[in-house]
Amino acid sequence: MKDDLIKLINELEKEREYQKIITMIEALSDEDKNSKIKLSLAKAYSHMDEFDKTIEILESIKDSESNTSIWNYCMGHSYYYLDNPSEAERYLLKALEINPEDKPSNFLLALLYHELGDIEEPEEAIHYLNKSLNYFNVYSKLDAEEDITEDLISIEQKLAWNYDKLRNHKEAEIHLRKAISLGDNEEWVYSQLAYNLRSQERYEEALENYQKVIELGRKDTWLYSEIAWTYFLIKKPQLALDYMKKAKELSPVEVDLALITRTASILLALAEHKEAIKMIEEVISKEEYKNDINLLSNLAYIYIDLKDYNSALTYLQRLKELGRNDEWLNKNLILVYSKLEK
């Protein structure tokens, strides 16, 4: 009878009739429920997203089944969906210790480590993402049933992002190009690659990739500001200003401090000191920006560049009153005082 029952359960599993399996097994007496049948019941509850019930049943057959990969996988699977990653990891690793070629365990552990890689700390994120990559690679060699291309692309993107955060731009570039080789042709990957290349001072290559991003349809403040700054870095300030104007037109905010700072540098390169001063003074006339350290520092620098040391001193002293006390400020105070004494 039990053989016939298990055969019927297997057929219902193929048809994904999990509620029928639950109803049928729950109707049995305790004597008729051996560990194999209870394991099937646990799996059925798991498919119905009743993970606490799944664990309860699995615990009841722990003595006879905990040395099997399927029991450990089911425990890991349940804890994964109960958002308990440490327990999920423990059982999935045990499943693979018993059977290293267990496809579901390799796949789920890869997903788990991928998710654990979504953290701010770059070194720790890289640690988890590399683990995820390793398990996906094992899974891919086991006659994989799932298409993992998008997962692999996502991991390569995140590895690149974290290496860029660590300023390891060469390693980041390797992962960005790997993502592209896997089929990633989205705006994000080329935006990141362009930023990466600019960080490596490979400006012409960066500009080529920024143009690729535009061709893919992205047109926003960040992109045009990045292009502008790249042109500024290769000493093409007029082109830089043209793109900065596009960036400002698309800015979602009235005052974008990052744009203002970059625009000021570009205007100085064009010897448009008065225009830079006018732009910054217009912003600091607003109550919320009147004590902005960065803007006031820019004004002081512009006046020093103009050799208007009295005006420069006004802003340097204001910066000191606001609490700035660093090498830049002290060096420029000494410079200004020395010029005014002559």
What feature does the model see in each segment?
Residues 3, 36, 70, 104, ...:
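Start-of-helix register in tetratricopeptide repeats
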Residues 16, 49, 83, 117-120, ...:
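Residue-level detector of the short coil/turn that links helix A to helix B
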Residues 27-32, 63-67, 136-152, 249-254, ...:
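Flexible helix-coil transition and linker loops at the boundaries of alpha-helical arrays
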